[in-house]
Amino acid sequence: GVYGATRRFPEEIMQELAIIRSKVGKKVFGVDLVLPPGMPEFNSRDEIEAEIPDAHKRFVEDLKKKYNVPDASEPGMRTRFIRSKEIEEQQLHAVLESDVDMLACGIGAPPEVVAEAKRRGKLTLALIGSPHHVVKALSAGVDVIVAQGYDAGAHTGPIGTYSLVPQ
């Protein structure tokens, strides 16, 4: 199986991988991280939120008032941290230092990440949503292509899996 760790802090990844390993023994398993290009350099919520246009903020506040939506009482999946190169590097370090067998990359498979994972003996996978993603993933050197269409649940791209695979 593959453990989706994109929304986990590095220390959580290390702890959870140790738990998984203790339960599966020597069986093979992997970790999936989303590695999109163009992320901000640092995990600065204040800087990112400052870039949100006032019109967007007013729109959300108006919806909350109109439908009586309370403020969140606990951090949610999308509010725990801001995706950044800083977090990505820490997550990758946690995965690469672990004894996990595979690294699956979503929304990009940076060649340097693929090379480092392979150097450490890990199988590399790329989750792709279109034919041009295949070309990029293969040029990055991944071992396995995982085709997933829009029907894969929360994955990007306009192509369904049954149409994507033959392409």
State each model region's role.
Residues 1-167:
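Active-site entrance/lid segments in N-terminal catalytic domains of soluble metabolic enzymes
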